[in-house]
């Protein structure tokens, strides 16, 4: 929840930051980009160190650290009177976002019973989307506080951050991590509280056996061996198009975009709430459809819809006076993203790489995804200043169209296959749709 909330709460503060820090000039456009994208740059650092720290200190300890960082970041950003301090606070928040977004799913997967592991990990992703939506509602209701409302928008995050920290105090450590440290009695106690005594004994035997048969570690350079190049090309490609088509830039600047379309400030915030609700609703739809229709149909339909929606937004800005069309097309764009590139990318990345390469590959591709996201968010204000909203959304639309061609050509269908079956099927370059 905090990951989604912290990432998008900045959208409400943008109109006020432009005034408070004097960011309306051409040079200010790039500074505004830094203010908004700083969380993304911090998240990259959090991504990079999360795995090492969670292996060394434990999953729970890292999550507690992220709670402290969330709290410190929100209060420092809310009280900042200097632009540099504000940037530092947002980078601090990014560290917590980057660490939490990788550590939380690992913790859930390691402590949850096998029968409910998939649904619980999915709920984690759903909570991020809900956090995004709640941030839009929070911003709307705090808007009436006047010129300092941006401070309240950023500072209110301290409440769920403090609650998050408090609840983590009552959460046990990951039993798998405890076993890696030889703390068998503690691991048994945790598993018994979650799964019962009999299941706990069996689970400890399975985990211990997996340590004995643990696959060799894969070096970074080995990921780029010839046999993995097509899979890596697809991984880097889908990660690029997920962010290069503008999703985070749109979320982070959403009220500003609606304002540029001609809406009043309060109306722009209200429209952002509607977009957030659509995002949540369509994420539920994606969870329901992904194992029924498959990955490729969702990707093809969703990315095509994104391209059409973005090009429609570009036209509406060019023609001017079409605020309602901008709203409808943005809702369509977010809905299409929420059933395609949003959830499907991470599902495919967790499926297509062989087990001994999976963790390293997802880490590398995830870092690339964060880099593209931060870059697109940084450049958005400067692009709007140089090209106008119409030109900016035209560029996003053309990239989405290119993404449709790329994904249609290379995306495999993995529905209904075990990971072991997929390893065999994807061991060589496959034609589009070969995996059924």
Regions from the language model: what does each represent?
Residues 200-211:
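Short, well-structured alpha-helical segments
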